[in-house]
UniProtKB/Swiss-Prot annotation:
Locations listed in the record: Cell inner membrane
Catalysis performed (reactions): a quinone + NADH + 5 H(+)(in) = a quinol + NAD(+) + 4 H(+)(out)
Gene Ontology terms, MF aspect: NADH dehydrogenase (ubiquinone) activity; NADH:ubiquinone reductase (non-electrogenic) activity; quinone binding
Membrane-related topology note: Peripheral membrane protein
Primary localization class, coarse: membrane
Quaternary structure, from the entry: NDH-1 is composed of 14 different subunits. Subunits NuoB, C, D, E, F, and G constitute the peripheral sector of the complex.
Gene transcribed to yield this protein: nuoC
Sequence similarity: Belongs to the complex I 30 kDa subunit family.
Lineage: Bacteria, Pseudomonadati, Pseudomonadota, Betaproteobacteria, Burkholderiales
EC numbers on record: 7.1.1.-
Any single GO CC term annotated in Swiss-Prot or TrEMBL for this entry: plasma membrane
EC class name: translocase
Cited function: NDH-1 shuttles electrons from NADH, via FMN and iron-sulfur (Fe-S) centers, to quinones in the respiratory chain. The immediate electron acceptor for the enzyme in this species is believed to be ubiquinone. Couples the redox reaction to proton translocation (for every two electrons transferred, four hydrogen ions are translocated across the cytoplasmic membrane), and thus conserves the redox energy in a proton gradient.
Protein name in the entry: NADH-quinone oxidoreductase subunit C
Keywords carried by this UniProt record: Cell inner membrane, Cell membrane, Membrane, NAD, Quinone, Translocase, Transport, Ubiquinone
Amino acid sequence: MTAIAIHPESLRDVVASALGDRVRQISVALDEVTVVVSAARYLEAMQILRDAPDCKFEQLIDLCGVDYSAYGATGSEGPRYAVVSHLLSVSLNQRLRVKVFCSDDDFPIVASVTDIWNSANWFEREAFDLFGIVFDGHNDLRRILTDYGFIGHPFRKDFPLSGHVEMRYDADQRRVIYEPVTIEPREVTPRVIREDKYGGLH
């Protein structure tokens, strides 16, 4: 693995200085820097991260949605949806994770970064398809993985594991048809391991 060109704590300070009051939180964990910015200033922050001389994050290498509604033991009490981006500076050999929370849980929306990095195009479509996060300014925001007639967003924590409908080919109609799911819900009993005499040990 190639050594990083800048120490994570130094990168944290560089990013904090470049973004100024656009930073809501910045941290280092496992030698990775994560910065949280507000949805209102997300686009502005991303432009700076690409163009600032000490940052030069020329590449967006990943972008995904996250549903925090079941995060942790009791679930998250903050905003439900976030968009997480991973940026790479090829010229400075450094990486950064950027997180932005959607301000409205009922209609999650953030600005599109496709005008800054065109690689965001399909990533944003995927986050829209699977989580229902709308990217304002995206010029072709439509589903990319699920079927055109699909209802709902399957990576949301409240989406049923079995889904709502199943599809099959109907030979009489000579087409694919949708039907309600026929899988019956069942109780799953958690496995209990008793410490006494576990595995035949005495």
